[in-house]
């Protein structure tokens, strides 16, 4: 039976993770109802109800929920909890590629909690919300909205008062900065991978181009589309995909090594088109909106002062940008780290662009994965 490309992507991601864990040959399809039995740790996925959730904008998101994935178990003191935020167009299944008994994120040692982003299609999103707030009527979501929901999950469901660490890649990294600004005093440390505390103007403009490419499809119909705006989604895909590697990375053909490998650039683009084409257009736009508004200073506690918010991150921080990231250049983290009280900047010297922070050989080199793992292990030893 054929799988749609979104499901195939999720299956492929999980297969890669399992192959790494068990050191067996990669297989293209996995029965997700059975693969959890093969994991050497306990895991579960569930919906956490937020009921009518008050947003930073003042609006209320009705019947809100987070889709939460947990790998590992809390110890008796609940001191081994790691919050692992999701990235743009990613999910808890994407994050699972970073787990392993020999990895820094070892679920036999830590309880790794992944709350999916709002607008991801997994937690409350334009595509899964009831009429009056569905599609283009879905409220605008900020990073702090996600952080407030996650804090409610951590404190009320798990009863955790002091999580050991908060980590995230890309949009997950931006969440890590936001979490640190609000909850650094009760958190062991944060690790933002390939992300900034504030979305730069250049990054904002790039994302705006991606948005307009999608919205230019006549079938988009201001978000009230009857069927997916395929041309717009393809235009979005081509725009966004261009940012994943820099000139040298694409010229060297590093993109052809992603996942199971591609014969040529066209097949790579076709794959990316199919993946983004399987994501709801309003969900994509919702995530982009959150990304564009990213700024840890945009909170009443900090009076729109980014430097003040950075100074309020009073827990240890390991900030790890990629040396070839077009979306979040390493140089943009330097002034941010300088404002933080206990932050270390460790650059991933890589050819693999933004995806170097994905922590998987499906996305980057083994050298990058080993380097990141080594530094996370060192950081965990420091804060434990």
Predicted features and spans:
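N-terminal export signals
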Residues: 7-29
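Catalytic active-site module of serine/aspartate enzymes centered on a nucleophile-bearing elbow/loop
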Residues: 343-384
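N-terminal cap/lid subdomain of alpha/beta-hydrolase-fold enzymes
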Residues: 69-131
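Alpha/beta-hydrolase-fold enzymes
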Residues: 186-188, 192-274
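Short alpha-helix in the alpha/beta-hydrolase fold that links the catalytic acid
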Residues: 306, 329-338
């Amino acid at each position: 039976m054929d799988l749609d490309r979104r499901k195939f992507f999720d299956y492929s991601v999980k297969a890669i993770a399992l192959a790494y864990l068990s050191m067996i040959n990669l297989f293209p399809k996995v029965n997700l109802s059975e693969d959890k039995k093969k994991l050497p740790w306990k895991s579960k996925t569930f919906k956490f109800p937020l009921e009518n959730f008050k947003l930073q904008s003042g609006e209320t998101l009705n019947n809100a929920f987070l889709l939460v994935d947990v790998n590992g178990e809390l110890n008796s003191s609940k001191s081994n909890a790691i919050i692992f935020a999701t990235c743009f167009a990613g999910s808890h299944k994407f994050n699972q590629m970073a787990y392993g008994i020999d990895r820094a994120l070892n679920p036999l040692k830590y309880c790794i909690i992944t709350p999916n982003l709002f607008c991801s299609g997994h937690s409350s999103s334009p595509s899964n919300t009831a009429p009056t707030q569905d599609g283009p009527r879905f409220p605008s979501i900020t990073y702090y909205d996600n952080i407030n929901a996650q804090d409610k999950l951590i404190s009320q469901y798990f009863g955790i008062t002091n999580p050991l660490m908060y980590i995230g890649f890309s949009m997950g990294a931006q969440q890590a900065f936001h979490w640190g600004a609000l909850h650094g005093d009760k958190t062991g440390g944060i690790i933002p991978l390939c992300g900034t505390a504030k979305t730069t103007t250049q990054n904002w403009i790039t994302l705006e181009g991606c948005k307009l490419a999608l919205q230019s499809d006549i079938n988009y119909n201001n978000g009230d589309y009857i069927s997916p705006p395929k041309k717009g989604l393809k235009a979005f895909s081509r725009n966004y995909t261009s940012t994943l590697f820099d000139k040298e990375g694409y010229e060297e053909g590093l993109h052809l090594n992603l996942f199971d490998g591609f014969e040529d650039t066209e097949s790579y683009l076709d794959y990316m088109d199919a993946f983004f084409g399987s994501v709801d257009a309003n969900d994509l736009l919702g995530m982009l909106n959150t990304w564009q508004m990213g700024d840890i200073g945009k909170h009443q506690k900090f009076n729109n002062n980014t430097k003040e918010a950075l100074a309020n991150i009073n827990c240890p921080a390991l900030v790890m940008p990629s040396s070839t990231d077009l979306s979040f250049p390493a140089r943009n983290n330097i002034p941010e780290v300088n404002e933080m009280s206990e932050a270390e900047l460790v650059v991933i010297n890589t050819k693999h662009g933004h995806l170097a922070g994905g922590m998987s050989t499906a996305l980057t080199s083994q050298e990058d994965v080993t380097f990141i793992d080594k530094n996370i292990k060192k950081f965990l030893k420091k804060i434990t």
